[in-house]
Design a protein with these regions (language model features):
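Long amphipathic all-alpha helical oligomerization modules
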Residues: 48-50, 57, 69
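Short solvent-exposed coil/turn linkers within tandem alpha-helical repeat scaffolds
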Residues: 1-5, 34-48, 76-89
């Protein structure tokens, strides 16, 4: 059965609500990968960084700054045209976990 990236992300959010952060992060990363593979014309690319950002925030909430930083840097490098990167918003996240 094929699920959509949004459904995969919703599953991740459900895990997060129940305190299962590792599983939540895994689901959100998978959702981003799924969104990327569906993005033949870059339309879905705007959603993948959002899923990754959620994963990074969850890692941050667990004080796993190193993993969060890796995700934030990946967003900045891979999704240069996303609003998150264009607005320099991602830099705030990178700066926060780099302290």
């Amino acid at each position: 059965m094929m699920v959509s990236p949004a459904a995969q992300a919703a599953l991740g959010n459900a895990y997060a609500q129940n305190g299962n952060i590792d599983k939540a992060v895994s689901c959100l990363k998978k959702a981003a990968d799924m969104a990327d593979s569906k993005a033949e014309d870059d339309t879905n690319n705007s959603i993948a960084p959002t899923f990754l950002l959620q994963a990074g925030e969850l890692l941050e909430s667990q004080n796993n700054k190193a993993e969060a930083l890796k995700i934030y840097q990946d967003i900045k490098k891979k999704y240069v045209n996303s609003q998150l990167v264009q607005s320099y918003e991602i830099d705030k996240y990178i700066e926060r976990v780099s302290e």
